[in-house]
Structures are given as structure tokens and as C-alpha cells.
Regions:
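Class I S-adenosyl-L-methionine-dependent methyltransferase catalytic core
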Residues: 1-207
């Protein structure tokens, strides 16, 4: 793109300007401290969606991603968030882990991840899915079978020798649209929208 811009320039001044900009994008790295995106080369990140409306034509089913567990994240969503708001080797916490989509993306992008899941059988599914993803960045993925509405997150982080997490991502049940279990502590079993919001608020307060 930059080369084409240079070739289409009609004055020496503009050619010089675009060459200087291209050189800067190649040789200098400028970040904002929040993520690893090189702001001098931001045009090259064509896979990062910059529009306010995200149109995803197809969910990512590559690697260990699959849609077998109902209501799970479309992988592109945590991928976009992690790349925008975290850096490599930082910690990400998902209090509604489900089948493990967030932690799979953590492994792909070089982020450490902690996932909390209420149902023991879903924990085993998540462990399987996450283990199938190659750990090319040698990051940690920790899975805890617990109730996020009651869990003392500070104590759990201390047990894992983690001082803090840099990003919290939540994909809770949409109240009663999908019933995930018979567990009364499951947010999808809340008796009313008010009860659901109270339980969700407890998770947010705990984290």
C-alpha cells in the first residue's frame, strides 16, 4: 500500500514524505503501552477490525476451536479484544470459561490465561480443547472448577503465584436463553432478570 502511494505521488515533496513514513514504519516501533500494536505501522494490521460494527462472515474453526458446546464465544471476539487491550505474557481472566475459547486464544497470542468454570464436566471439555492447541509461546493456562459468584479471586491468584491480571473478559449466559445446567448457582437458572443481574454483579465485584 505504501509503495503504491509513493508511485502515485505527483511531487518530489510528497514522494519524500511517503518514503520517510515508510522507513519509519519499518525501522521504528511505537506502542501505546496497552498492547503490542506498532502505531507506526498500524495500516498493516488489516485483520484488526477498526469499525464499530464487527461483521464476521464465519466463525473461526481452526486448530482446537469448535462449536460443539452451545453458547460459546465466537473466537474472533476474544482475539480482537486480547490484541487490542493486552500485551504478550500478560494475564487474562475469564470467569465464564465454558469450553475454553478465551484460553485457546491466549495460547495463540502469547497471553497467560485463567479460566473459571462452574460445571466439572465442562471443565474437562475445556482442558481437552485447550490442550490440543499448540503452546508456541510457552504461556500458562490455569483452569479452576468453581463458582465465580462466590470465589475469592485474590486468594486463587495468590495460590497460583500470580500478583495481578491485566484483562478481564466475560461472556456470561444470556439469562435463560440457554439452560446450561441444573445447578442453582448457574446464572442461566436465575429466577428473574433481577436475580440474574445480582449474580452477575457478584462476579464483577469478586473480580
Amino acid at each position: 500500500n505504501e509503495i503504491n502511494t509513493i508511485l502515485k505521488s505527483q511531487t518530489i515533496e510528497r514522494i519524500y514524505y511517503y518514503i520517510k513514513r515508510l522507513k519509519k514504519s519499518i525501522l521504528e516501533v511505537k506502542t501505546n503501552g496497552i498492547n503490542d500494536i506498532n502505531l507506526n505501522n498500524w495500516k498493516e494490521y488489516d485483520d484488526i477490525i477498526t469499525d464499530s460494527l464487527w461483521i464476521l462472515h464465519k466463525r473461526d474453526n481452526s486448530g482446537s476451536h469448535n462449536a460443539k458446546y452451545w453458547g460459546n464465544f465466537i473466537p474472533q471476539i476474544p482475539n480482537q479484544f486480547l490484541r487490542r487491550y493486552t500485551k504478550q505474557n500478560e494475564w487474562v481472566l475469564d470467569p465464564f470459561l465454558g469450553s475454553g475459547t478465551t484460553l485457546i486464544e491466549c495460547k495463540r497470542l502469547g497471553r497467560n490465561g485463567i479460566g473459571i468454570e462452574l460445571q466439572s464436566e465442562v471443565v474437562e471439555l475445556a482442558k481437552t480443547n485447550i490442550s490440543l492447541e499448540t503452546n508456541i509461546f510457552n504461556v500458562r493456562t490455569e483452569i479452576i472448577n468453581a463458582d465465580s459468584t462466590k470465589l475469592n479471586f485474590k486468594d486463587e491468584l495468590k495460590k497460583l503465584n500470580i500478583s495481578s491480571v491485566q484483562f478481564l473478559i466475560l461472556h456470561p449466559p444470556y439469562w435463560d436463553i440457554i439452560k446450561f445446567s441444573e445447578n442453582p448457582n448457574d446464572l442461566s437458572n436465575a429466577k428473574s432478570i433481577t436475580d440474574f443481574l445480582i449474580l452477575l454483579g457478584n462476579v464483577i465485584d469478586n473480580t
